[in-house]
């Protein structure tokens, strides 16, 4: 039996001097022990997800905790059967989550160490979900929400996180005077965003401490009131959260049947994320439209070594055709 792989999800807002140099040092250590993953380091802190066997991940956690700046850093641990990453990246960025307040004329950035929403543990958050007078706001990207979300949570009409402040300003009259609680995958986005809401004048702002990942592991709530699966930014794509009464809410793009399998459209210039079974991915050569399925840069065709004839036959089977100028 192969050894279990541990996936570590973590972040910490803390001032890091010479953050760019520290990022290079961090990458060197990770590579030296064979760790895989993706880590962002900025002047404001660190945010990462990494994977490896028990020994490797333990070495990494011990090394991180040996630095007094990260002595109390909270690692959220998942056990998996295979690696969640193929390579190791450590990058220096302006922010460890891209809210982009300064770039989008929202005044100065937020320091969560100074201003942030009230921390709610899983039990308190569940109570908020059941409270009709509380507004629950999902702060993640739209495609994350579509895979899974808390029951009754608002889905902002946004494509990504940095669009959220404008959406809130456009809709603040709907919940300005209400209690608002926010949530995200591991907590890092909510730390900053809930602080921004406080600065905007919202009087009662809470956040799920530790994020969805912690809610799903809590022995008391066991992920209850979560519908679907949780999107993660690694090779797993999704992980289960609700261990009481799990459901599948996402539907196959092609036939509408329950499906939690995300793929990217075969056309690299589209790249739309869609839910598709392996059968339908094959049938529709992973394209979200006739134009994408017949695109000359069709990645599915290239990855699977389909000849032009095989490609044309796939399209003919669904009533479409391959233009004369397109070649495999």
UniProtKB/Swiss-Prot annotation:
PROSITE patterns: RHODANESE_3 (PS50206). SMART domains: RHOD. GO terms for biological process: tRNA modification. It is an enzyme of class 1 (oxidoreductase). It holds the Pfam family Rhodanese_C. InterPro entries: Rhodanese-like_dom, Rhodanese-like_dom_sf, Rhodanese_C, TrhO, TRHO_N. Residues 130-224 form the Rhodanese domain. Keywords: Oxidoreductase, tRNA processing. It catalyses: uridine(34) in tRNA + AH2 + O2 = 5-hydroxyuridine(34) in tRNA + A + H2O. GO terms for molecular function: oxidoreductase activity, acting on paired donors, with incorporation or reduction of molecular oxygen. Its EC number is 1.14.-.-. The active site is at residue 184. Belongs to the TrhO family. Catalyzes oxygen-dependent 5-hydroxyuridine (ho5U) modification at position 34 in tRNAs. This is tRNA uridine(34) hydroxylase. It comes from Streptococcus pyogenes serotype M2 (strain MGAS10270).
């Amino acid at each position: 039996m192969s050894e279990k792989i541990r996936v570590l999800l973590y972040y910490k807002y803390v001032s890091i001097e010479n953050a760019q140099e520290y990022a290079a040092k961090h990458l060197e250590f990770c590579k030296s022990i064979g760790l895989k993953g993706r880590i962002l380091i900025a002047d404001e802190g660190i945010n990462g997800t990494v994977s490896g066997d028990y020994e490797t991940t333990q070495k990494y956690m011990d090394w991180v905790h040996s630095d007094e700046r990260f002595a109390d850093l909270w690692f959220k641990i998942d056990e998996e059967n295979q690696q969640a990453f193929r390579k190791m990246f450590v990058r220096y960025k302006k922010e460890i989550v891209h809210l982009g307040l300064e770039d989008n004329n929202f005044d100065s950035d937020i320091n969560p160490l100074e201003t942030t929403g009230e921390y709610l543990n899983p039990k308190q958050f569940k109570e908020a979900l059941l409270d009709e007078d509380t507004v629950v706001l999902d702060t993640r990207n739209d495609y994350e929400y579509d895979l899974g979300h808390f029951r009754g949570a608002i889905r902002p009409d946004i494509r990504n996180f940095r669009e959220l402040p404008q959406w809130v300003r456009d809709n603040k009259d709907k919940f300005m005077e209400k209690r608002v609680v926010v949530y995200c995958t591991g907590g890092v986005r909510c730390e900053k965003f809930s602080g921004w809401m406080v600065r905007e004048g919202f009087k009662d702002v809470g956040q799920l401490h530790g994020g969805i990942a912690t809610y799903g592991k809590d022995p008391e709530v066991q992920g209850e009131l979560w519908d679907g699966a949780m999107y993660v930014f690694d090779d797993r794509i999704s992980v289960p959260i609700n261990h009481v009464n799990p459901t599948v809410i996402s539907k196959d793009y092609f036939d509408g049947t329950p499906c939690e399998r995300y793929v990217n459209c075969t056309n690299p210039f589209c790249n739309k994320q869609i839910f598709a079974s392996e059968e339908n991915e094959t049938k529709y050569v992973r394209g979200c439209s006739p134009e994408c399925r017949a695109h000359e840069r069709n990645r599915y065709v290239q990855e699977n070594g389909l000849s032009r004839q095989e490609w044309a036959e796939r399209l003919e089977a669904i009533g479409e055709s391959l233009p004369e100028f397109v070649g495999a």
